[in-house]
Amino acid sequence: MSRLSAESVTLAYDGRVIAEDLSVAVPDNSFTVIVGPNACGKSTLLRALSRMLKPRAGSVLLDGAAIGSYPARKVARTLGLLPQSSVAPDGITVADLVARGRHPHQGLLRQWSPEDERIVQESMAATGVAALADRYVDELSGGQRQRVWIAMALAQRTPLLLLDEPTTFLDIQHQIEILDLCAELHENQGRTLVAVLHDLNHAARYATHLIAMRDGRVVAEGAPGDIVTAELVERVFGLRCQVIDDPQTGTPLVVPAARRAAARAAGSAAESAAESVAGSATGSSAAAARPAGPPSA
């Protein structure tokens, strides 16, 4: 089953077609990760799934109906989005930004309630930013800010959560913390997550469903253990590699071919061959130059 899907969509920016006749279905209750080389269309696909980009042709479906047919507030109650570059308003505190996640649930007949306050507090606690509630967002580190944005998305209480490169600009420690948090949301809260990631090894470790794209089309999709092979990596990324089991998780681990080592080995072999040829030539020259000995008796 799939609550969110794209059917034969054509996606374009500024008149340039990025993807054509593209179809994907996000499995319910999955942590789906979209991977592929730069400019392959993965972020474009995510924007279409989130209703940020209207397809030129085809349809994005939410619960069986075209996503564009729903009022924006209804979509915001069902689908949360963490864009690639989020900028907080000047002078806003962590608690105030997270509280904005409750806006889709407000209206003329429903104002801020104790339930909203409880959800905001729970969202900050779940992302580890409760102690930062009174801090200004622009004073925080990159990892802390990313957690705050995720807390705001959590406060929407949507069953679907889309994240566009949530680990961009973070160091390795904060990357793992954010991905661990996403895994917890999927495993413990039953949310369906869709994320765009650049790191294939991170994707293979955390995803339950992987979509590999190249040139605006889906090359392969399925469980990482079923589809991540050396052949797929070379086909999608143009990278020669070996795929082994991750010693920590047993998931596929991509080990790039040692190109520098191979180049050094080739260089050493060529140097040895050149020295051998030079040595042979020197020996021949010396023999030719050696004066003849006395005539034999």
What are these regions (language model features)?
Residues 4, 18-21:
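Conserved structural motif at the start of ABC-family nucleotide-binding domains
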Residues 50:
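Helix-to-loop junction immediately C-terminal to a conserved catalytic motif
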Residues 58-66, 75:
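Conserved ABC transporter NBD signature motif
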Residues 99, 114-132:
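Conserved ABC ATPase "signature" region
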Residues 111, 136-140, 144:
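Conserved ABC ATPase signature
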Residues 161-165:
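Catalytic Walker B motif of ABC-type/P-loop ATPase nucleotide-binding domains
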Residues 237-297:
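ABC ATPase nucleotide-binding domains
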